[in-house]
């Protein structure tokens, strides 16, 4: 008489299903993280230009301009190429604020949220600003909240804080475009109560979400009515005025 074929236990079936589901999930997460917005027309801003020297360092790209006392550490937006912010960093450096543009693992600022501290360990400036775009802005504001003694001011581009900074004496400049289709304005309004007393909020008329960087159009964003160059110019001008 033939022996009955043994059937896999219910528990093994469940664990096999779970394992397969996890592998599929991780596959799509990997695809998501590896798919990002590439920079557009930034080559001229990746090498020395005028008074600004550009060089790579351990955590990204350093823009060393004519200024000597002020510097900004800048976190890019989620899934955006680091060098898409090269034109903006160049303009800040030309105006006396050296910039450290941080290269995030998988283009996600929450993974390298602590990198600002690493930069500050290696460089010495009298005044430090923390800046970022979108998720990068939220993450560097988060880092600032727990390292408030290391920062003098914040620049939040299409971003808002998630931790309380209201009792601090740092400055904060929030800037977004009137045509931004990505930014959650309800969160911006809620975030106002978390910002320090020395805060200003500026809306760039005609600007959108993507044109703080140079990476083309972003899915879901509004249609800008000003150029990226003009949006960056107004951004730098506003920060220099209110920092």
Show the residue positions of the predicted features.
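Active-site-adjacent alpha-helix of alpha/beta-hydrolase-fold enzymes
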Residues: 176-230
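Conserved alpha/beta-hydrolase fold motif
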Residues: 130-131, 154
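Short beta-strand/loop motif that positions the catalytic acidic residue
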Residues: 168, 174-176
């Amino acid at each position: 008489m033939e022996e009955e074929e043994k059937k896999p236990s219910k528990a093994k079936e469940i664990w096999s299903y779970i394992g397969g589901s996890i592998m599929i999930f991780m596959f799509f997460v990997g695809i998501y993280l590896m798919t990002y917005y590439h920079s557009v027309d930034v080559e001229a801003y990746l090498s020395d230009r005028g008074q600004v020297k550009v060089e790579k360092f351990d955590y990204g790209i350093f823009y060393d301009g004519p200024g000597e006392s002020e510097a900004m550490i800048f976190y890019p937006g989620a899934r955006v190429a680091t060098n898409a912010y090269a034109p903006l960093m160049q303009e800040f450096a030309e105006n006396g604020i050296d910039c450290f543009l941080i290269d995030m693992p998988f283009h996600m600022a929450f993974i390298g949220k602590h990198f600002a501290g690493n930069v500050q360990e290696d460089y010495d400036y009298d005044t430090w600003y923390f800046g970022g775009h979108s998720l990068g802005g939220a993450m560097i504001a988060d880092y600032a909240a727990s390292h408030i003694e290391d920062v003098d001011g914040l620049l939040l581009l299409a971003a808002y804080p998630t931790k309380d900074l209201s009792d601090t004496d740092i400055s904060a400049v929030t800037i977004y475009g009137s045509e931004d289709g990505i930014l959650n304005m309800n969160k911006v309004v809620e975030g106002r109560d978390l910002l320090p007393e020395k805060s200003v909020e500026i809306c760039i008329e005609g600007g959108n979400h993507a044109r703080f960087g140079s990476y083309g159009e972003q899915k879901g964003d509004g249609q800008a009515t000003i150029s990226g160059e003009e949006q960056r110019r107004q951004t730098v001008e506003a920060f220099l005025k209110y920092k």
